[in-house]
């Protein structure tokens, strides 16, 4: 067994390579100067005694949206402290909140914490209108300029009550600005016209990073995180990176893999972080292309496992039906026998049976998220064929446990597949 403190490491500061924004936030985003200037323009009225503009920030995951807003609101707060400006910024992460009601409860809590300090409880048992009035009351108690940032606002779905009512609330003595951050590029277009009018016209789009930009981002992270890694002539880009830890192809491969899909910087950073950890855990002194490829395979498997574990019931039952045929050695298998087995599982688990068409949609959802492989039918009337995109043991091990919803069905499958229930 290894002893703590006895091992050499290639890390100088591991946190800098951690993709978790709560662990490390960069002090600048050189690739996003245009977008930061647009955010600056929307917030600048606050420095002139006016109300900052409402703003919607768009972009796919890992494009710097949240970090960009935090950098500019932090900068504005520093200005406010120096100029004795009355400014309050409230950040709400909406992921996991399925409507305006939950966003309002968290907003009440955060505003109370701005007034009284940490530890305030979420309000419960109130009507939506009452919660809105509680928000307005707390805004008026806080006073001054208040910027409310709603991150991942698309999580609330079609329930845009807060987006309509809050910008129109006009609390006394408050200059209120609402900033929505979303991964949904069609978010604004899907809102009602009245809601779009309430939010105003300002918007900022974060386009996907390209491979060159990702190389520069990874280079800056590497310099902060790794020993014997630096920029030549103090020029902070990949071309001036010098490292005794990273081989020449390590960062280009991580950047290329990150750029392949959506230009997600977080995914590229996660790849390099995992690759570097593989090398460091084995007491190796260099991080190579092979470490990056190993990291890619590892993270893809972990993502699929996590995706299986969090599937909604109907998708889980569809996956179980395909898994059943995988155990029998019958895959790839057409839709009809999968649907037949799905109905059997629904009856066993006392779950409503979807129509054949809606069931096919669930199979396609699983294929779109790389849980299933899909083979298109060759012509009209030919059914699509499906098989597991992961090995059978991985699928079985990540189905619900015996004590969980659908666990009884999963236990039967694991017994048939020769995998012990854990």
Q: Where do the language-model regions lie?
A:
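Short, hydrophobic-biased segments on the C-terminal half of alpha helices
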Residues: 73, 163, 360-364
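Terminal-proximal interaction/regulatory segments of ATP-powered molecular machines
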Residues: 332-422
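Conserved catalytic segments around the Walker B and adjacent sensor/switch elements
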Residues: 55-56, 79-96
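Conserved C-terminal helix/linker of AAA+ ATPases
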Residues: 278-299
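Walker A/P-loop nucleotide-binding motif
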Residues: 51-71
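Mid-core helix/loop region of P-loop NTP-binding domains shared across ATPases and GTPases
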Residues: 2, 96-108, 112-201, 206-217, ...
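Short alpha-helical segments that sit at the start of domains
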Residues: 300-321, 325-332
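A short, basic N-terminal segment
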Residues: 1-53
């Amino acid at each position: 067994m290894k002893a703590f403190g006895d091992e050499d490491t290639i890390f100088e500061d591991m946190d800098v390579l951690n993709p978790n924004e709560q662990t490390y936030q960069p002090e600048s985003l050189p690739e996003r100067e245009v977008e930061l200037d647009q955010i600056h323009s929307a917030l600048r009225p606050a420095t002139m005694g006016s109300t900052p503009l409402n703003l919607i920030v768009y972009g796919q995951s890992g494009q710097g949206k949240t970090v960009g807003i935090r950098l500019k609101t932090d900068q504005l707060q520093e200005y406010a402290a120096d100029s004795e400006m009355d400014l309050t910024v409230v950040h709400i992460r909406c992921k996991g909140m399925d409507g305006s009601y939950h966003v309002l409860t968290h907003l009440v809590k955060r505003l109370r914490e701005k007034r009284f300090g940490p530890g305030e409880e979420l309000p419960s048992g109130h009507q939506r209108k009452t919660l809105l009035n509680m928000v307005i009351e707390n805004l008026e108690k806080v006073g001054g300029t208040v910027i409310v940032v709603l991150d991942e606002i698309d999580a609330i779905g079609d329930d845009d009550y807060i987006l309509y009512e809050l910008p129109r609330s006009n609390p006394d003595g408050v200059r209120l600005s609402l900033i929505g951050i979303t991964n949904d590029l069609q978010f604004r277009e899907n809102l009602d016209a009245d809601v779009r009018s309430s939010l105003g016209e300002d918007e900022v789009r974060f386009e996907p990073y390209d491979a060159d930009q990702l190389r520069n981002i990874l280079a800056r992270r590497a310099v902060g995180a790794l020993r014997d890694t630096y920029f030549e002539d103090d020029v902070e880009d990949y071309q001036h990176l010098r490292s005794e830890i990273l081989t020449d192809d390590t960062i280009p491969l991580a950047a290329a893999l990150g750029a392949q899909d959506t230009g997600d910087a977080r995914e590229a950073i996660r790849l390099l972080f995992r690759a570097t950890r593989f090398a460091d855990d084995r007491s190796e002194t260099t991080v190579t292309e092979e470490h990056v490829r190993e990291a890619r395979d590892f993270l893809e498997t972990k993502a699929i496992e996590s995706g299986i574990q969090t599937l909604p019931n109907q998708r889980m039952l569809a996956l179980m039906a395909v898994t059943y045929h995988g155990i029998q050695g019958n895959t790839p298998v057409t839709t009809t026998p999968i649907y037949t087995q799905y109905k059997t599982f629904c009856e066993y688990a006392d779950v409503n049976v979807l129509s054949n068409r809606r069931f096919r949609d669930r199979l396609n959802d699983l294929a779109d998220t790389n849980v299933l492989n899909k083979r298109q039918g060759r012509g009209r009337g030919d059914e699509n064929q499906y098989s597991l995109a992961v090995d059978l043991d991985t699928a079985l091990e990540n189905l619900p446990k015996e004590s969980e919803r659908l666990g009884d069905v999963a236990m039967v499958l694991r017994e048939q597949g020769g995998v012990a229930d854990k």
